[in-house]
Amino acid sequence: MSRSLIRIFSVIGLLSPITGLADTFAGKILDETGSPLTGAVISIPDSGKKVTSGIDGDFTFDVADKNTVKITVTYLGFVPNSTVIRSDRNAKENTIRMVPDPTTLDEVVVTATRTPKTLKDAPVITRVISADEIARTDATNIQDLLTEEIPGLEFGYAMSQETSLNMSGFGGNAVLFLVDGERLAGETMDNVDYNRLNLDNVGKVEIVKGASSALYGANAVGGVINLITKENKEPWHLSLNSRYRNAGNEWRSGGNLSFNSGKWNSNTSVQYSTVETIKLTDAFDTESNIHEIFGGNTLNVKERLSFRPTDNLQLIARGGYFYRESHRSNYDDHYHGYSGGLRGMWNIDPSQNLEVSYSYDRYDKSRFVDNRCTHDHDYSNRQHTLHGLYTKFLGLNALTAGADVMHDYLTTYQFVNNESRSQTSADVFVQFDYNPLSWLNIIASVRDDYFSASDNNAVTSRFAAMFKLRPLTIRASYSGGFRAPTLKEMYMCFDMAGVQMIYGNPDLKPERSHNFNVALERTGQIRKGVFAGSYSVNLSGYYNYYNRRITTTDFPGSDTLEEGAIYTNEDGVKVTGADFNARYRTTFGLGASFSYNYLHTAGRKVDSQFTQPRPHSATWKLDYDKQLCSVYRLYAGISGRYFSKPESSLPTSGAYSLWKFTLQQSVWKGININFVIDNLMNYRPKIYYWNSPATPGRTWSIGVSLDINDFFK
């Protein structure tokens, strides 16, 4: 018996090293620039194994009795890569380079549907500007960023050199700006203060063109632009930055500090900028509307604190302070902004969630002469808002219902004796996201808004469908929009510098818009050859009918009021246009993009010296982004934008193009050096009209940012 056992164990011992032999496979996962991708998932279909790449992009695994194996690598924002690797090669020889997928980069979007949805699955066209793209533009605020990235969008000046937006034929009061889904209080010349929208702690910007009032209510007539805050995933992060620009000796400095302990997540950001007045023309120029760009300084402070008491519940508190001075020749204008809010997000169970929030925003303006407040230009707008949003998932479908209540308070020097006015608005809305087939998605929504001051209500709806018919994705939608009359438009009584009186009209009706949109999209990859990479091409056409537009008309006077201008509703404008966008990036770091917008307006157009839409506009970029070695990364790009001459009977600026060169270098651990030459061709308008590019010619800037936490990795 003992001899038999010995023989059995001997045979097992001889077989063990044979059957137990396994081949070790090693590799490295890199992005298109050569930077390692941490957390990429490597799947081995034959064995069912899955491993993830480490901090340097490295991975290893064992498979018995094989010297070659097929793997599939997946990583958020990149095209899945299936390839064969060998065990007799080292990690460097088994390097796998991932290609960005333009349809999924920063793929989760919320603005178009108010629920998380991948970009490729959103039935409403959404443009996403990622954190990397924001960093490459070196933009200080949303105005700088959008000017470079979006064709058909232009910033100019209105009276008193206040910033004025025109986007696809719509003014600033018809485009809704949000920060994490919350509105901003205050306006000047019908535009929010874009300096409040700094980008120091912004993770991405989502842009939805066309009416979106069925989800967002008033002002979402021409589109929605939503700035979404970063949420740090590292235990701690500290970044410091400073930039100098020669025009106006401009300095911009800031910092961002984040902590993440799992349950607690905090993000604090501070940005301060100062600039001197920039002379555009000499004292003998009598034709230009703008002779100088006023200097000043700006401070932005923001805090966002998140707490997860359980895996299913998240509580968020936020606060912010804004201060800006604009230095004029004989006075200074001061601007203050205060914001705060609380939000709770509860995943009740896997099939339903609830979100409740409160938001407060305040915007004040005042005028100072010799450092003393004159009190003749005092302004304060305060908004309190309550939100509720409930989503129920029904298999692949989703039902969303929500309600909002907002109290709007305004006191301004444009009212009689600086009196105050207020109104309360309330709304309810419902949306159904229907996915009957793998290639078909339909979304329908309806909303009713009520406004107490004008005793008006507005019902809006949206219907959108997406068809995935390979290789094309087709999107089509109808959406209604409205803009309620503001407190200023209803109750204004203002002497405009002795030129004329302007009167409000309490009987104004809400503006209405009807938007129709069709878009075709094609995405894909070139897998082999010199130009291996990914591409995205989309073409869209749209039609907007904008009715009951609120504007001013001549007022003959009355027994108690002198003649002047009064706010009124009038027949609107028809806007037809098309957008074309193409993006391409190779596996070796070369990228190119081109965007074009065509715009045609008809009907009762406002031929204003401040708002003059241009029929043709385009933006383009050619860049190279490469991790050349472990301690050096290079980004170089040349970009530009073009605007045709506006169709106007008034004196206006002509067609122009502006070019920009950007060089960014990442050295060692967390040291980034930026150098920019703006207006590369040194373009200067002969006459600076209100809508001319306010450029002094070619300028340059240099900046440094330090990611302190990377020093210790």
Residue ranges, per PLM feature:
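Gram-negative outer-membrane beta-barrel transporters
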Residues: 435-442, 536, 542-546, 566-646
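Extracytoplasmic beta-strand/coil segments of soluble accessory domains associated
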Residues: 62, 126, 143-182
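Membrane-embedded beta-barrel scaffold of Gram-negative outer-membrane proteins
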Residues: 264, 355-367, 407, 468-469, ...
